[in-house]
Design a protein with these regions (language model features):
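Right-hand nucleic-acid polymerase module
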Residues: 1-123, 133-221
């Protein structure tokens, strides 16, 4: 008997990377089996799906536009320099990226970035972001930030890049509803009271190539 599966394939980094996603088509089931009654969708279900989609899109962009050697950075604020609101923090980050874009352009390079601005539950602000490196980007982003500390690390080459980019995508899309697991398995209280996720406008989401598969299921007595 047949069961239909939908496959989506993303060809990333000029086809150097293939990312494949497969989902069972809920419209079809195995022959002779009754479909389960549809469960009512809860607000928690919607939040979970929205978070999953947000993280997935971030991961695909990370895999398409960034590579090992690019940078994962954090901007922090001294207490006296904390922004009064999210709009101010957005403008401050964009002002830095505008400066960097001009430098990149002079060198014949394009600037890509993904960022998440977070205000902690205790009032501290910081900005996590990924940016493509052109050799001295670490020193460029450090000199351009006058409001506090700068922490930079390289994205390292990995045997499991898809898993690593998934972790990075989950981290950079945190919001007020994100609760991390504690060692005892319980969920910690949210550590973010306000957040804003965004990316540079020159990073369109690659389109997947869809394909419908029919799987044969064998039943034996």
């Amino acid at each position: 008997f047949g069961m239909k599966t939908k496959r989506k394939t993303w060809y990333l980094q000029k086809k150097d990377i293939l990312y494949v996603e497969e989902n069972h088509d809920g419209k079809y089931g195995a022959k002779g089996q009754k479909r389960l009654p549809k469960r009512k969708t809860t607000p928690e279900d919607i939040q979970r799906v929205n978070r999953w989609n947000k993280s997935k899109k971030a991961k695909i962009r990370l895999m398409e536009y960034f590579s090992p050697g690019d940078l994962w950075a954090t901007y922090t604020y001294k207490p006296e320099n904390r922004p009064p609101d999210m709009d101010t923090a957005k403008k401050q980050f964009l002002a830095v990226m505008d400066k960097l874009r001009k430098i990149y352009r002079k060198r014949g390079r394009e600037l890509f970035w993904i960022r998440n601005i977070e205000k902690g539950t205790k009032g501290a602000w910081h900005i996590h972001f990924v940016i493509n490196d052109i050799g001295d980007t670490a020193s460029l982003i450090e000199r351009a930030w006058p409001y506090g500390g700068v922490y930079v690390t390289q994205i390292r080459k990995s045997n499991c890049p898809e898993e690593d980019f998934q972790k990075l995508a989950d981290y950079i899309t945190k919001d007020e509803r994100t609760r991390e697991k504690k060692k005892d398995g319980t969920l910690a209280k949210p550590r973010v009271s306000e957040s804003s996720y965004s990316h540079s406008r020159n990073m369109p989401l690659p389109e997947p190539v869809p394909k419908e598969l029919k799987r044969c299921l064998l039943y034996t007595s």
